[in-house]
Amino acid sequence: MKSTIFFLFLFCAFTTSYLPSAIADFVLDNEGNPLENGGTYYILSDITAFGGIRAAPTGNERCPLTVVQSRNELDKGIGTIISSPYRIRFIAEGHPLSLKFDSFAVIMLCVGIPTEWSVVEDLPEGPAVKIGENKDAMDGWFRLERVSDDEFNNYKLVFCPQQAEDDKCGDIGISIDHDDGTRRLVVSKNKPLVVQFQKLDKESLAKKNHGLSRSE
């Protein structure tokens, strides 16, 4: 009996530690469906004046290593794979996440670069979101938080350094390059970037790309 009680105590303690993740609200796409763990989505602006999230070269970069918001409102950006290390089907608010661009979307621009997002320190624009290998990349993870209670399913991206308290996490916002207007994603104390998610239909996209290649 004592061993059974001890086992139940350990079981309750373990499951309780994961309770906030279990009861957290699911993150919803723009059709009201929960985001799938490991699914691919366009990350879109909540306003129509700007486009989606993609990679672009900035400064002296030869490859598209900087994560930016497109200034073209018709550009949905690059599909982004959103994954949690938890063995769960759907993404919920507050879950630790890794984000990476679909490799096929950038392979034509610069072969072989890692496409996982990271936050890089010691840049003029502040801690900025980048892809590729970088020695100044911070250890940490992203998470999603809802910013409105309406039907539009608006969220903000948050970056949390590894082993940091919640008050050390920072919202992902926009830093505008005054020379060329590039809208870089950065960790910001100002207004966060508010986004929505649109599921990427890979099968339809593959058919479209196949049709384009045959017509060229």
From Swiss-Prot:
SUPFAM superfamilies in UniProt: STI-like
Gene3D superfamilies: 2.80.10.50
Site entry (Reactive bond for trypsin), positions: 87-88
PROSITE patterns: SOYBEAN_KUNITZ (PS00283)
Domain of life: Eukaryota
Propeptide: 206-216
One example GO MF annotation: serine-type endopeptidase inhibitor activity
Disulfide bonds: 63-110, 160-169
InterPro entries cross-referenced by the UniProt entry: Kunitz_inhibitor_STI-like_sf (IPR011065), Prot_inh_Kunz-lg (IPR002160)
Protein keywords: Disulfide bond, Protease inhibitor, Serine protease inhibitor, Signal
Signal peptide: 1-24
Family label: Belongs to the protease inhibitor I3 (leguminous Kunitz-type inhibitor) family.
Protein purpose: Inhibition of trypsin.
Other comment: The sequence of variant A is shown. Electrophoresis identifies three genetically distinct variants, A, B, and C, that are inherited as codominant alleles.
Name under which the protein is recorded: Trypsin inhibitor A
Protein's gene: KTI3
